[in-house]
Amino acid sequence: MPRRRSVEARKILPDPKFGSELLAKFINVIMVDGKKSVAESIVYGALETLAQRTGKEPLEAFEVALENVRPTVEVKSRRVGGSTYQVPVEVRPVRRNALGMRWIVEAARKRGDKSMALRLANELSDASDNKGAAVKKREDVHRMAEANKAFAHYRW
């Protein structure tokens, strides 16, 4: 633990097209090897496809999809007297967004469609309909937390 003041989080610049900090963060999650322009073209292409498919604004459709993937509780391992318990804890808002984005990207990369933009569009579309691999991941995490509710008093 540092003894000095805590470091404030860096301010992230909003994305150039929609002016959303959340979308800028998502572009950074998609980015591989520092190729931001490639990541931006993938995300914007996916959002265009998603907007045509749903008939909503691209940013609104993205936020609905992300909201359906965000976890509210997760389990953390806690060692008590020689045995390890999976203790359910509430997820902080920043981590909630980060996990949701990471799960969407992982699920999109595992899909078998042609381009990454198409895979991402399909995963976001599934997430906004409350189905798909990313939503399944959230359900699994919630199920684990529910199953280990008895150990909630070990919270720290």
From Swiss-Prot:
Family annotation (SUPFAM superfamilies): Ribosomal protein S7
GO terms for cellular component: cytosolic small ribosomal subunit; ribosome
Pfam families for this protein: Ribosomal_S7
Keywords: Ribonucleoprotein, Ribosomal protein, RNA-binding, rRNA-binding, tRNA-binding
MF annotations from Gene Ontology: mRNA binding; rRNA binding; structural constituent of ribosome; tRNA binding
Any one Gene Ontology BP term: translation
Superkingdom to which the source organism belongs: Bacteria
Keyword set includes Ribosomal protein: yes
CDD domains named among the record's database cross-references: uS7_Bacteria (cd14869)
Keyword rRNA-binding: yes
Function in brief: One of the primary rRNA binding proteins, it binds directly to 16S rRNA where it nucleates assembly of the head domain of the 30S subunit. Is located at the subunit interface close to the decoding center, probably blocks exit of the E-site tRNA.
Family, similarity comment: Belongs to the universal ribosomal protein uS7 family.
Assembly notes: Part of the 30S ribosomal subunit. Contacts proteins S9 and S11.
Protein name: Small ribosomal subunit protein uS7
Organism: Haemophilus influenzae (strain ATCC 51907 / DSM 11121 / KW20 / Rd)
Originating gene: rpsG
